Amino acid sequence: MTRTLEKVLSRNLIHLGQRIFLFLLMVDQIPEHLVSAAVLVIWMFQFMLEKPLYLSQLENRFIMATENDKSSNEIEKEATTPSPLTPVPKPTTEDKRWGLNGRLAFAIAAAALGSSFQHGYNTGVVNAPQQLIENWISDLKMNRTGQVTKQSEVTMIWAIAVSIFCVGGMIGGSLVGSIADRFGRKGGLLLNNILVLLTVIFEGCAKAAKSYEMIIIGRFLIGINAGLNAGLAPMYLSEISPIHLRGAVGTVYQLVITMSILVSQILGLEQILGTDDQWPLLLCLTIVPAIFQVVTLPLCPESPKYLLLSKGKDMEAQRALAWLRGTIEVHDEMEEMRTEYESVKLVPKVTLKELFVNPSLRIPLMIAIMVMFAQQLSGINAVMFFSTKIFTMAQLDKTAAQNATMAVGAMNVVMTFVSLILVEKAGRKTLLLAGFSGMFIDTALLAICLAFADTSRAAAYSSIVLVMTFVILFATGPGSIPWFLVSELFNQSARPAATSVAIAVNWTANFIVSIGFLPLQEALGAYVFIIFAALQAFFVFFIYKKVPETKNKTMEEISSMFRQISYQ
């Protein structure tokens, strides 16, 4: 029945794409490059939904390659005994090098580049062409009404277009659990790209159709996409990673976000795509990572933990794990998953209500919620918003200030990469404490320096240094760890529901900051950063008291720890 429904859905979606293509051909005003892009996108989703023959052949070749590595005795034993082979000793530190191989790296790239790139790119892409799009909206409204458009009206429309991205993120985040359970982590990521297609159609055709409402709809749809990606991608990355690489692989999600924000800043320059004619193309480039993911992710297996713990497919989970590890010596990991599977079978599927009622689940849920609040209420968005103004205060001209802002973005990328290395050495809790403690001191000093920046060159230059330092501190832990920490705190049965709550909270906090920062900044000036400093001090105390260290711990060990705490 399920396969029949999937075939009907695939057929209907392909027919919908063909009708959209015919519509684009009939509308003369639509630029040719958008029609060409539509052809490519429709083929892309036909590729994803119909699963061409050569893709199946490639998958079979991967499976056969794994099977050929087995000896005849192993194959005979596997055929007669579905249970695992005798566990081998746990790998030593020297043996752990096999954990990262070409196939695992390929799966990480397919999942992260196609998902978190959407998140970061669409966060930053609207900044550079803001004035161009506002002018277009103003002219459009004047043509509609025959009256000069008030700047306040244009500002309101633009604010809605920007902030509705967060509203979409809240909705997408709340859907993570149901999508992850229904379609799987990999399947959910692939289907999520349909929203990217719709976004490109709306945003790419908005100027030709003379409708700023299409920009708002597109931003809303890509917000839902980003919200789903923020839950599904870290979940998939966490579940396919060896235990000793789980933190490093989880950090990749934030690393790609910082990279994509930097890419959006560069492409938005006036010398590249930041022009009246090219800004629709700038918005439409979000389709590129979607195409990459739709082509590459089908070659990767579904999460082994999802296959075994959620679907009970032992052999498929073992094949997927062998593919990801590049070796058939996966019996130890399979034993750990089977142990978790036996414990999961003893309890019913975790509901949203159960998360708040069960003490052993409520404690990690509160931790997950607080670290998500901490990330967004740390003041990073406010500092990034203020960065260009701070550089201008230091008497840098407009071009130099823009270049300095991009340098901050580049530093964010570099330091997030550094955190990818540190997270498995220093641990999650240590990096969170170091990051938020340093940010507390930095933010308090930044508020003081900004208050005197207009009259003191020394204060203005000190502000630049403090902004750079703030970004470094944020990138070393608070920026990346919350995304994957949620997946580490919960077992398989509770993870989808808990991730839905945590991601929805993250986007809600993001929305609160985006809406509330400007009014507070107008009322308090530079002293608005004192609020962020106070919040950071609270988060340091909370992390020190409540957040456990999850480095190198299995899911069963973490769950057992929370059960013991709940009984105390």
Feature locations, PLM:
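Alpha-helical transmembrane bundle of multi-pass membrane proteins
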Residues: 2-6, 13, 21, 27, ...
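Short linear segments in intrinsically disordered or otherwise low-structure-confidence regions
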Residues: 32-33
